[in-house]
UniProtKB/Swiss-Prot annotation:
Glycans are attached at N100. It is found in: Cell membrane. This is MFS-type transporter cnsL. Its main location: membrane. GO terms for cellular component: plasma membrane. It holds the Pfam family MFS_1. The gene is cnsL. It is a multi-pass membrane protein. Disulfide bonds: none annotated. It comes from Penicillium expansum.
Length: 482
């Protein structure tokens, strides 16, 4: 075999992937027991040129997939951020005065969007398994109901664990504050009959509606239904994913996987970490411009000074994700250590006097590196969950953690503490410490699980379980990212 050929048994390209058990299940009529990818393995395995493809062929295929998926997902996630940060941009243009909002009412406006997610997350998660992913995704772009959960599911369908951190850092970006700051700055020169804050919401709403239509026609539901891929390319995509033991998709809802997800200690540790990391996000998203204007800057200056946090979050997220992508053994340690940076920023904001404008701004900007550990943590649980129903359950549960943190965040910023917002700063410090402990504990649990499995596993075990829609606990060949 040529040196530039890879097989489905090569490392690190895949491990043994025969899918014999899954193919036998299909032939026996037990389709509900397998991942939908097993069907294409069964249909096309005999048509392939052996089980080989070149490194260059794989590289070109990934590049094509990137160009089809990443830009669309990037725009969707950015618009989701614009939708949530628009309230902060509107705050510098008298939305509180025009609507006669008290400090508490403004805080609840920042929390309110996430209550919808909490109420409808269960039904929406069930729908995500039962209906095609992309029409459902497009609908949620229109409603912004569970976009992040949908994005996470799409990424996990297409990419291997070592490829996910880089894509997550680009897709789940924080460019929204940059765009919102620029839009707010431009709107600041508007002299028309409408209030300036209304113009901001009109622009964001119009972009959202257009994007939902584009998503419906551009994104494929899954690799098997991707019209831009040939049968051979679909086969390669599926075989690349096979070694991860995480599957692609199954339309059968399995209640036993729901219970496994709920009673898994790892679920709760990640839940705590996500909720803790999102408390600062909820507060800063709603009060960012008020914090800056409280330092003595006018509306136009505040709009411009609100742009760097987006760059800090995005660049730190990309940098940390690229570092995390180099290993599957130390990702939780990398995430934990990275939380020290936003923790330092929070301490600066708390300790420095308000008269130290430069120090306060530096502390605020450093605070925004909190997005890096969060987006990297997403790639950790993406890689560590198998079984389609379990994935859906956990993604829904983690969205609830995300929403809970974002609901609590604005409530820690009290109007009677303005412009210092001491309660909000102290809450961020506490949450960062809690997140560090939860992520460390998660890494330890995963490490101990891997050690226990290594004592019993045989090489053939993983191959026998390909595409059987098993969970990470059921498949003893599954190895957790730590």
């Amino acid at each position: 075999m040529a040196a530039d050929q890879v097989t489905i048994s090569d490392e690190p390209k895949g491990g043994g992937v025969t899918a014999d058990a899954a193919v036998k299940a299909i032939k026996a009529g037990r389709n509900k027991d397998v991942d939908i990818a097993a069907q294409i393995v069964s249909d096309y395995a005999d048509q392939m040129d052996g089980d080989t493809w070149s490194v260059e062929e794989e590289r070109k295929l990934i590049r094509r997939i990137d160009w089809r998926l990443i830009p669309t997902l990037f725009v969707c996630a950015t618009l989701s951020g614009l939708d949530k940060t628009a309230i902060s941009a509107a705050a510098v243009y008298n939305i509180k005065t025009d609507l006669n909002l008290t400090g508490a009412e403004y805080s609840w406006i920042g929390s309110a969007p996430f209550f919808g997610g909490l109420l409808f997350m269960g039904p929406l998660a069930y729908c995500l398994q039962r209906v095609p992913a992309v029409p459902f995704f497009a609908f949620n772009v229109l409603c912004w109901g569970i976009l992040e959960m949908s994005v996470t599911m799409v990424v996990s369908m297409w990419y291997r664990p070592e490829e996910q951190p880089k894509r997550n850092s680009i897709i789940l970006n924080v460019v929204a504050p940059i765009i919102n700051g620029f839009v707010a700055w431009v709107v600041g020169y508007y002299k028309g009959p409408y209030e300036r804050w209304k113009i901001i919401f009109l622009l964001v709403g119009a972009l959202t509606i257009v994007t939902s239509v584009v998503v419906y026609f551009v994104l494929p539901n899954n690799p098997l239904e991707a019209k831009f891929l040939t049968p051979r390319e679909k086969y390669i995509v599926i075989q690349r994913k096979a070694a991860d033991n995480t599957g692609i998709e199954s339309k059968t809802f399995k209640m036993e996987q729901v219970w496994e997800a709920i009673f898994d200690i790892k679920t709760w540790l990640i839940w705590i970490a996500i909720a803790a990391l999102q408390v600062p996000n909820g507060g800063l998203t709603t009060f960012n411009t008020l914090i800056i204007s409280g330092l003595g800057f006018d509306s136009l200056q505040t709009s411009l000074l609100a742009m760097p946090p987006g760059a800090m979050s995005t660049l730190s997220g990309i940098g940390l994700s690229y570092l995390a992508a180099t290993t599957r053994r130390y990702r939780t340690a990398i995430v934990t250590v990275s939380i020290l940076l936003p923790l330092f920023g929070a301490v600066l904001c708390y300790a420095l006097p308000r008269t130290n404008l430069a120090g306060q701004l530096v502390g605020l900007y450093i605070l925004y590196t909190y997005w890096a550990p969060y987006v990297t943590l997403v790639s950790v649980y993406q890689a560590n969950v198998a079984g389609h129903t379990k994935k859906i359950t956990l993604y829904a549960w983690f969205y609830i953690a995300w929403a809970t943190g974002n609901i609590i965040g604005p409530q820690t910023f009290r109007a009677d503490q303005a412009p210092e917002y001491t309660g909000g700063t102290v809450a961020m410090i506490i949450c960062y410490v809690v997140a560090m402990f939860a992520i460390t504990a998660y890494g330890v649990v995963c490490h101990l699980s891997n050690k226990k499995r290594a004592e019993a596993i045989e090489a053939r075990t993983a191959a026998d379980h390909d595409w059987l829609d098993m969970t990470d606990k059921e498949n003893v060949g599954f190895k957790y990212t730590t």
